[in-house]
């Protein structure tokens, strides 16, 4: 094994270690590894994407945005970078801008349930309700046990007054995650609205 292969293997091992730390919720520990990788190579796209993802999980949006912007500047094929930028714009309720970036992420990485979930919600929130619901349904078809998707789709159906469908989605989310406060509140909202409509 030559020096470049050994170096590449070391980088991959550290990226994998950072990924495992991220998945176990140890974002700050993951960031230490990733930041060291970026000191060694400021153009390491994978490390930039992972920094952005960890910062997003910690709700440090400015830092996540900076890392994601750097990733897409260096690599226009960074679907993770475009997804994170779109997610942040959604969080700021800049729906049309979010839709553009999330569509770009979806184009680069089709059929990714999380990208589709965020794109669907941004479409729905931007006034493209039918397309938003269809996109959320696609996300749910890809990942049928995701409480976030179930709740987002349920809220969309609630807003178009399809209470039966909304309630079923929220109850499914509660089956999967009984402590899900959002789903509990949404079930209560459906019940209140159903009673109000019946008079």
Annotate each language-model stretch with its function.
Residues 1-13, 197-198:
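TPR-adjacent "capping" and linker segments in tetratricopeptide-repeat scaffold/adaptor proteins
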Residues 9-46, 50-60, 91:
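Alpha-helical segment of the N-proximal tetratricopeptide repeat
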Residues 23-32, 58-70, 91-104, 125-138, ...:
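Structural signature of tandem alpha-helical TPR/SEL1-like repeats
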